[in-house]
């Protein structure tokens, strides 16, 4: 006896039982240890921060990262699944700042870096318990006991080794560049981090400013263009546009495009220079404003404006101005002049760009080699310094309003507007970023770009477009990586500098630091190692560590080495098992973890860090917006699991485009649909087997061990004679082949759909068409073969699906397994494909008949002809002889499935329909041009016979104004007009028609089918076993009191009703009499325009 199965299973509760089983039996540990001595399969798990709770963004990659290791384990590999925690960086620091009421770096330093860092250490793992609970409940197996933490000394020491290796390869340097900078966090961010925080639409001022011209530099192009009589009028202004008024006090130049046309115009009593293509935008009629009249004086190329000087807007850096000779004692070629910039466009603004080399990458670049210093008069919190005395201590963005008011007062503001544009924000605190000049340590990524591209060429990406698309393009444009952060809680950059002679060294280990300083650092964090100094060998001075800590992305990118404490330990093991076989994360990590892993692996080993990568998309709320706790636009995923179970959620996520790096709009309804449409049917198939096997005393076949190599399958196949059995076993084997191929390619988008399709075939074709074989009372060979076939199918499908839906498959396995089977389905071997089980001919036959049936059902649905209503006939035409052979052979199946009385085959489709045709304008239009209309009129006059001939490959010649045109099937669009009482549908070579004429007898049989369905439903509601016999009471309801049609129908089909419902005694009552029978369970059953009232009781 099998353990009885409740068809109304509570999946969530059942999953809790499975979790207890796994824990009690140490199944996860056994899944690893049982593969000792086998080949290792290496999986890297990217470390999350434990300062926040897991969310849907973690559930998708988490499920993927469970499926592949489970599959590879079942395929015989030893798969360690070591979890890790990202412990350093801004996420932790921001959290502690809020908790301690600290608002700036100054506050932190007053509080004490040592106390601040220790507070970070104490809180960094605060949600570990919740993470473990959530990950475990999702069904994901990971090794928490052997986890790695980026704050542990061994991990941190390996990072120092990585730094020292880059140093020795000449790939580390210190530079002063324009970088994205967070004023709130007071630190630089790397370019790849911009995409993590995202760009948000913000409103900013957009102002046009007047810069009064001076005489040009004499030797410049402008000096030649504007000399003598060509000199500019004294009231000439350059018009420049900016969305960052706060950078104007630091303006040192104006940029123009060399090949852009610029105009001098006279307007409102003054002269202005701006780009010709932008004149319309500034002076044309706009809204209620009238057009502004101006006079065009001349146009010149931007190249001729180079060297034109102008008055500084503000006095702060006027000492840097160029003289007429293009020189300045303090600033080389001098500032406050027009330069050529290849970044200038005429898409917006005036075509003249204000440049502040301390606050713009392009601005900085065009001043390179001019000798003009990079002016950046702001402090660590982006407040103006004493250099900009009028705004000293004011946050730069807060100065916008005051600066604009001043410009207006001084007559320098030409136009003021507002712009909505996309602007980068900090990925941790969501503050708008500032681009500013800042000193930083860099990895010279541009030096190794070829290595990066070569590494990428060796990676199998899923989806594959990531290789040459998002990731490949990002690598092609890769820039040097700013790895230093002006923060506190992180891995200190292991570089010591001598303030006296500038000598600089990089330390690669704690032991090396001890040799150099005499101190061995037990703790490697900033507040410890900053106290360690090194005697300078060059000058005898004292070397101090540089103040910055490392970007936490550098740490996660080093995890392959640091989790092993490489090269200080596990050297041989690491080198034997690198690169990793598999990683997976979301699409955003193409600019994050995937990128940093690739940089460091290519730099250190000339290899990729991983061989295969599945990239998932973003999970959005149902309304398409980002999931937000504040908006409450999604259900807590833990609540989803409580309601539907983890398997349903996993399958919903994996059977979507999110596994193809596309976005997914999450909905509870979608998970519910997976439960109802896939998991419950799967459970019903299993429940059906168990229920009837127990009734008949059937035990698991002794030789049906189906994991790995099938046992006894060929002997069993030789005995089978029912095509349905041979077919479902063949389809099961096809499933093994398809899913194995997809998973071996890491293509989940091709692995999950075949499983979903299989459940439908098993439940709605094999079991439904085999039910009577299980129901019959005699235990003959056919019945036992049906049992063993279904057993093998259920067991093998469970093995195939186990990595995806680990809970339901474990529950089923525990009831189906024999003593020779593995303790857990996840300790079993994945099924090997057995070609001998495949029967392609039989698969073709079933697919053909299923296609015809599906088309017939579609017609029923389209025309509201419910399946329980018998129809006179299905009429079929096929132009494919093989299809016709199969359909003739499977005629009985078609009759049963479509609930028709007969199948009528026709030779030609015109026996079912009349044809009309229209011209295919797409095809004929190109050929006929102006003659098209006349051709269309002729085509519309074609008769049905002519159209039929064309469909069969003939050509019809028509004459249009003396021109002969050959009409073939591709040149016409065919419309089918059904003959009386027929509803038809066509797919390629197959046409299916339903005869919808309903006779009185067909209608009565339809009523009876509805009745049987109603009785079966009532049996379930009464909790009757499938073998229980019943007494049946029935009458017409009050809706159609004492209706003779229903009584007549029942008498006509009484034997059928009793056989189908196990009725041993039936009584026809007058309307209303059922209510007098007391405690009998009753129900109303609709039947066409009529309604039955029925009651049943168990026959004791």
Curated annotation (Swiss-Prot):
Domain comment quoted from the record: IleRS has two distinct active sites: one for aminoacylation and one for editing. The misactivated valine is translocated from the active site to the editing site, which sterically excludes the correctly activated isoleucine. The single editing site contains two valyl binding pockets, one specific for each substrate (Val-AMP or Val-tRNA(Ile)).
Recorded protein name is Isoleucine--tRNA ligase
Provide a Gene Ontology MF annotation, just one: isoleucine-tRNA ligase activity
* Family matches, as Pfam families: Anticodon_1, DUF5915, tRNA-synt_1
For the motif 'KMSKS' region, give the residue ranges.
626-630
Alphabetically sorted, this entry's keywords are: Aminoacyl-tRNA synthetase, ATP-binding, Cytoplasm, Ligase, Metal-binding, Nucleotide-binding, Protein biosynthesis, Zinc
Q: Which GO terms describe its cellular component?
A: cytoplasm
Principal localization reads cytoplasm
Q: Name one GO biological process term.
A: isoleucyl-tRNA aminoacylation
| Complexes and interactors | Monomer.
SUPFAM superfamilies from the entry? Anticodon-binding domain of a subclass of class I aminoacyl-tRNA synthetases, Nucleotidylyl transferase, ValRS/IleRS/LeuRS editing domain
List ligand-binding residues for ATP: 629
What this protein is reported to do is described as: Catalyzes the attachment of isoleucine to tRNA(Ile). As IleRS can inadvertently accommodate and process structurally similar amino acids such as valine, to avoid such errors it has two additional distinct tRNA(Ile)-dependent editing activities. One activity is designated as 'pretransfer' editing and involves the hydrolysis of activated Val-AMP. The other activity is designated 'posttransfer' editing and involves deacylation of mischarged Val-tRNA(Ile).
* Enzyme Commission number(s) of this protein: 6.1.1.5
The chemistry this enzyme catalyses reads: tRNA(Ile) + L-isoleucine + ATP = L-isoleucyl-tRNA(Ile) + AMP + diphosphate
Q: Where in the cell is it found?
A: Cytoplasm
Top class in the EC scheme:
ligase
Describe the family membership recorded for this protein in Swiss-Prot or TrEMBL.
Belongs to the class-I aminoacyl-tRNA synthetase family. IleS type 2 subfamily.
Has the keyword Protein biosynthesis been applied to this entry?
yes
Position of motif 'HIGH' region? Answer: 48-58
Q: Which cofactors does the annotated protein need, by name? A: Zn(2+)
């Amino acid at each position: 006896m099998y353990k009885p199965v409740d068809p109304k299973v509570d999946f969530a509760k059942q999953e809790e039982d499975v979790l207890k089983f796994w824990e009690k039996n140490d199944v996860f540990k056994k899944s690893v240890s049982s593969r000792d001595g086998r080949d290792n399969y290496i999986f890297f798990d990217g470390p999350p921060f434990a300062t926040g709770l897991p969310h849907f963004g973690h559930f998708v990659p988490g499920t993927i990262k469970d499926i592949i290791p489970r599959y590879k384990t079942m395929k015989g590999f030893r798969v360690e699944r070591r979890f890790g925690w990202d412990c350093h960086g801004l996420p932790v620091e921001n959290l502690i700042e809020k908790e301690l009421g600290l608002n700036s770096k100054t506050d932190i330093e007053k509080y004490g870096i040592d106390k601040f860092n220790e507070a970070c250490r104490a809180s960094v793992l605060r949600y570990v318990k919740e993470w473990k609970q959530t990950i475990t409940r999702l069904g994901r197996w990971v090794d928490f006991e052997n986890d790695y933490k980026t704050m542990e000394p061994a991990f941190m020491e390996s990072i120092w080794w990585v730094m020292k290796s880059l140093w020795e390869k000449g790939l580390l340097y210190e530079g002063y560049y324009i970088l994205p900078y967070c004023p709130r966090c007071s630190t630089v961010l790397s370019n790849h981090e911009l995409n993590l925080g995202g760009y948000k639409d913000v409103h900013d001022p957009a102002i046009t400013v007047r810069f009064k011209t001076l005489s040009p530099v004499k030797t410049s192009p402008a000096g030649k263009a504007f000399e003598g009589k060509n000199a500019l009028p004294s009231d000439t202004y350059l018009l420049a546009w900016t969305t960052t008024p706060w950078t104007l006090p630091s303006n040192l130049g104006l940029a123009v495009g060399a090949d852009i046309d610029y105009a001098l115009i006279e307007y409102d009593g003054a002269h202005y220079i701006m780009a010709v293509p932008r004149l319309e935008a500034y002076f044309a009629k706009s809204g209620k404003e009238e057009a502004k009249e101006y006079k065009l004086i001349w146009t010149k190329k931007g190249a001729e404006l180079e060297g034109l000087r102008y008055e500084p807007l503000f006095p702060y850096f006027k000492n840097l101005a160029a003289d007429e000779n293009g020189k300045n004692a303090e600033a080389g070629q001098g500032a406050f002049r027009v330069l050529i910039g290849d970044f200038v466009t005429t898409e917006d603004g005036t075509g003249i760009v204000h440049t502040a080399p301390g606050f713009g990458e392009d601005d900085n670049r065009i001043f390179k080699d001019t000798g003009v210093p990079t002016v950046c008069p702001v402090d660590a919190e982006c407040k103006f310094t004493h250099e900009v005395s009028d705004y000293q201590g004011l946050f730069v963005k807060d100065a916008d309003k005051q600066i604009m008011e001043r410009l207006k007062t001084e007559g320098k503001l030409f136009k003021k507007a507002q712009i909505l544009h996309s602007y980068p924000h900090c990925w941790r605190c969501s503050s708008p970023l500032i681009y500013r000049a800042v000193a930083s340590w860099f990895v010279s990524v541009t030096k190794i770009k070829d290595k990066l591209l070569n590494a990428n060429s060796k990676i199998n990406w899923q989806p594959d477009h990531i290789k040459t698309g998002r990731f490949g393009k990002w690598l092609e444009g890769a820039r040097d990586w700013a790895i230093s952060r002006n923060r506190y809680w992180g891995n200190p950059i292991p570089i010591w500098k001598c303030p006296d002679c500038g000598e600089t060294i990089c330390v690669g280990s704690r032991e090396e630091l001890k040799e150099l300083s005499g101190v061995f650092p037990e703790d490697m964090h900033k507040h410890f190692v900053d106290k360690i100094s090194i005697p300078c060998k060059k000058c005898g001075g004292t070397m101090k560590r540089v103040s910055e800590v490392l970007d936490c992305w550098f740490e996660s990118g080093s995890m392959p080495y640091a989790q092993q404490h490489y090269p200080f330990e596990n050297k041989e093991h690491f080198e034997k098992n690198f690169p990793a076989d598999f990683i997976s994360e979301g699409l955003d990590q193409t600019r994050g973890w995937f990128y940093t892993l690739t940089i460091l692996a290519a730099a250190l080993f000339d290899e990729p860090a991983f061989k295969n990568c599945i990239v998932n998309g973003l999970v959005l709320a149902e309304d398409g917006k980002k999931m937000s706790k504040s908006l409450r636009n999604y259900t807590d995923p833990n609540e989803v699991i409580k309601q539907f179970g983890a398997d349903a959620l996993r399958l919903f996520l994996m059977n979507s485009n999110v596994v193809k790096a596309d976005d997914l709009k999450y909905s509870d309804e979608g998970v519910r649909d997976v439960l109802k449409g896939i998991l419950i049917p799967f459970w019903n198939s299993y429940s059906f087997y168990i229920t009837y096997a127990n009734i008949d005393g059937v035990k698991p076949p002794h030789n049906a061990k189906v994991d790995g190599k099938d046992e006894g399958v060929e002997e069993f196949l030789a005995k089978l004679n029912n095509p349905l059995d041979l077919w479902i076993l063949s389809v099961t084997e096809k499933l093994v082949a398809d899913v194995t191929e997809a998973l071996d390619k890491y293509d989940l988008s091709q692995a999950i759909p075949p499983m979903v399709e299989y459940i439908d075939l098993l439940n709605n074709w094999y079991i439904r068409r085999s039910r009577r074989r299980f129901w019959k009372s005699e235990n003959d060979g056919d019945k036992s073969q049906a049992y063993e076939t279904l057993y093998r199918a259920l067991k093998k499908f469970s093995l195939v699906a186990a990595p995806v839906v680990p809970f339901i498959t474990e529950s089923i396995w525990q009831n189906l397994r024999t003593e020779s089977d593995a303790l857990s389905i996840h300790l079993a071997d994945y099924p090997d494909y057995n070609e001998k089980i495949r029967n392609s001919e039989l698969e073709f036959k079933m697919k053909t008949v299923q296609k015809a049936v599906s088309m017939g059902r579609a017609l029923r649905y389209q025309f509201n002809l419910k399946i329980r209503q018998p129809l006179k006939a299905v009429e079929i035409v096929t132009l494919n002889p093989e299809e016709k052979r199969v359909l003739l052979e499977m005629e009985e199946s078609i009759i049963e499935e479509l609930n028709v009385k007969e199948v009528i085959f026709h030779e030609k489709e015109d026996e079912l329909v009349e044809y009309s045709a229209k011209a295919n304008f797409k095809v004929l239009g190109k050929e006929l041009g102006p003659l098209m209309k006349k051709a269309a009129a002729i085509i519309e006059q074609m008769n049905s016979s002519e159209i039929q001939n064309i469909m069969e490959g003939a050509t019809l010649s028509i004459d249009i104004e003396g021109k002969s045109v050959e009409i073939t099937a591709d040149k016409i669009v065919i419309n089918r007009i059904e003959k009386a009482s027929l509803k038809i549908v066509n797919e390629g070579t197959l046409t299916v028609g339903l005869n919808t004429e309903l006779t009185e007898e067909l209608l009565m049989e339809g009523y009876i089918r509805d009745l049987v369905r109603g009785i079966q439903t009532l049996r379930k509601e009464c909790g009757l076993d499938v073998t229980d016999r019943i007494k049946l009471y029935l009458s017409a309801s009050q809706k159609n009191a004492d209706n003779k049609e229903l009584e007549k129908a029942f008498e006509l089909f009484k034997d059928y009703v009793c056989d189908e419902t196990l009725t041993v005694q039936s009584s026809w009552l007058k309307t209303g009499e059922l209510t007098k029978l007391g405690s009998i369970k009753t129900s109303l059953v609709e039947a066409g325009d009529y309604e039955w009232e029925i009651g049943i009781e168990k026959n004791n």
